Regions:
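Conformational switch/transducer regions in large eukaryotic molecular machines and scaffolds
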Residues: 1-148
Length: 148
């Protein structure tokens, strides 16, 4: 994977898009994060999964590929969130104010080691920068099936 690299794999089902993504991730030595879609999976579950992904990449500082395919698009908001991740590294309003102190505490030591500062704004910026550096979004799309 290229630094801050992402990928979109387009092809018919069964052509090896997901296998290729997993192979590339393995070769790069990074983990793969895949969400499990169920019948009742909606925006609340999606946002919880995004928080887990951000904790892995932003707090734990673990390089991770997020593999997402078009059959997992249950709501258009999923695609909007992916667009936000790709453009800015964050999802607006993902966290409530009560969740932020745990994030700040999780990145405080690494931020201090990087001489990044210790204000809430600086810790948030460090968290987002860690996500942008560690998260690689891989979209596996099948053009005729993609509703968006």
């Amino acid at each position: 994977m290229m630094p801050r690299g992402n990928a979109m794999l387009v092809g018919v089902g069964g052509s090896g898009r997901q296998s290729l993504a997993r192979l590339a991730s393995h070769i790069a030595g990074i983990g793969v994060f895949v969400i499990e879609i169920t019948k009742l999976y909606r925006l609340i579950e999606w946002r919880d999964d995004m928080k887990r992904l951000f904790e892995i990449t932003g707090v734990s500082n673990t390089p991770t590929a997020f593999l997402f395919n078009d059959t997992q698009l249950k709501e258009q908001a999923f695609l909007e969130d992916i667009n936000n991740i790709l453009s800015s590294g964050e999802i607006p309003s993902l966290y409530g104010k009560d969740e932020l102190p745990a994030i700040y505490d999780g990145v405080r030591k690494r931020a201090a080691d990087a001489e990044s500062g210790g204000t809430a704004e600086e810790l948030w910026a460090f968290f987002i920068e860690s996500i942008r550096s560690n998260l690689h979004v891989i979209l596996a799309m099948s053009q005729p099936l993609c509703p968006y």
